[in-house]
């Protein structure tokens, strides 16, 4: 099993693949909803006067989603014509950007969760990080996140080829396939989300001791972002783990068929995750529409910072 149909950074690329029509629909919806939605989030964060750490981290998260969705038209073309006819350079570029954005997204979500935990468990630290150094801290953390993600995404170029009209992963050995799949699953999904889950388990105990409704609203927002990422990327990483199990069993059999059939729709679902966050922010901000005319998302997160510091 030296090659696999696709990876974290590409939806299914041939209309003959089962589920390709579903993938085409999901991708079109993601681009149509996600690009303007994330652009609005970026504008909302840019015009706010109080640029707290959560606001700045969410702006970088929206930027990662925009990077992913800007590659959507290339994949839509490939899906519509049934082949990849745009050359190896665009194949590499699209997959590299999307793989990097995947890592950036999950790392920033983990940082958001960590900041939320600190805001509740260490209110004094929340006050400090909400001060004049907030921008430097957030942009520094985001820059480090992007740098690490760009390095981790290199395998998406190394193991990517255009063969028989398809831009797909090709591994020279099964060991490289196992390495690639486990790298994505552990560092791009399981480890960061496990850390957030543990931190939030402790945070829930703290929240039960407070009556601050606004803090609960922000808590639910961040939880929704975490859960949305975990759910939309879960099937993709499950397919990756199935491929690893197939290699361990010597290849072939029903499990390999299931892994190959699961990968295309699972990858399309993962791509859709880039369009979900703006919808979650909109739902979380519904209760803040009355009052000042400032942006809802920054205002929601500012309330969170104030609540964390007044415990």
Stretches found by the model and what they are:
Residues 2-14, 79, 83-103, 121-122, ...:
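Loop architecture of class A 7-transmembrane GPCRs
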Residues 18-48, 67, 194-200:
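First transmembrane helix
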Residues 19-23, 56, 137-141, 180, ...:
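Alpha-helical transmembrane segments of integral membrane proteins
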Residues 19-24, 28, 51-112, 118-130:
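Extracellular TM2-ECL1-early TM3 structural module of rhodopsin-like
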Residues 21-33, 56-59, 63, 97, ...:
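Residue-level signal for short hydrophobic patches within transmembrane helices
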Residues 31, 60-72, 141-153, 185-193, ...:
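Alpha-helical transmembrane segments of multi-pass membrane proteins
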Residues 38-41, 72, 106-113, 153, ...:
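Hydrophobic/aromatic residues in alpha-helical transmembrane segments
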Residues 231-240, 261-311:
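Seventh transmembrane helix
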């Amino acid at each position: 099993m030296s090659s696999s149909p696709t990876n974290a950074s590409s939806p299914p690329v041939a209309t003959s693949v089962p589920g390709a029509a579903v993938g085409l629909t999901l991708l079109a919806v993601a681009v149509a909803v996600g690009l303007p939605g994330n652009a609005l989030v970026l504008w909302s964060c840019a015009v706010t006067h109080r640029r707290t750490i959560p606001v700045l981290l969410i702006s970088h998260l929206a930027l990662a989603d925009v990077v992913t969705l800007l590659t959507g038209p290339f994949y839509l073309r490939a899906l519509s014509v049934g082949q990849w006819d745009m050359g190896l350079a665009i194949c590499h570029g699209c997959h590299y950007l999307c793989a990097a954005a995947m890592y950036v997204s999950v790392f920033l979500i983990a940082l958001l969760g960590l900041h939320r935990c600190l805001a509740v468990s260490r209110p004094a630290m929340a006050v400090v990080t909400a001060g004049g150094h907030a921008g430097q801290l957030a942009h520094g953390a985001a820059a480090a996140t992007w740098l690490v993600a760009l390095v981790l995404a290199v395998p998406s170029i190394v193991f990517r080829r255009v063969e028989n009209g398809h831009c797909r992963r090709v591994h020279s050995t099964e060991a490289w396939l196992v390495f690639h799949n486990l790298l994505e699953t552990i560092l791009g999904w399981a480890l960061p989300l496990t850390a957030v889950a543990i931190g939030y388990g402790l945070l829930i105990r703290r929240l039960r001791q407070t009556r601050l409704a606004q803090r609960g609203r922000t808590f639910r927002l961040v939880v929704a972002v975490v859960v949305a990422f975990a759910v939309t990327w879960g099937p993709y990483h499950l397919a990756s783990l199935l491929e690893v199990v197939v290699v361990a069993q010597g290849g072939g059999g029903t499990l390999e068929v299931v892994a190959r059939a699961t990968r295309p729709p699972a990858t399309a679902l993962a791509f859709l995750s880039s369009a979900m966050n703006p919808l979650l922010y909109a739902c979380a901000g519904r209760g803040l529409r009355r009052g000042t005319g400032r942006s809802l998302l920054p205002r929601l997160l500012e309330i969170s910072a104030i609540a964390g510091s007044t415990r």
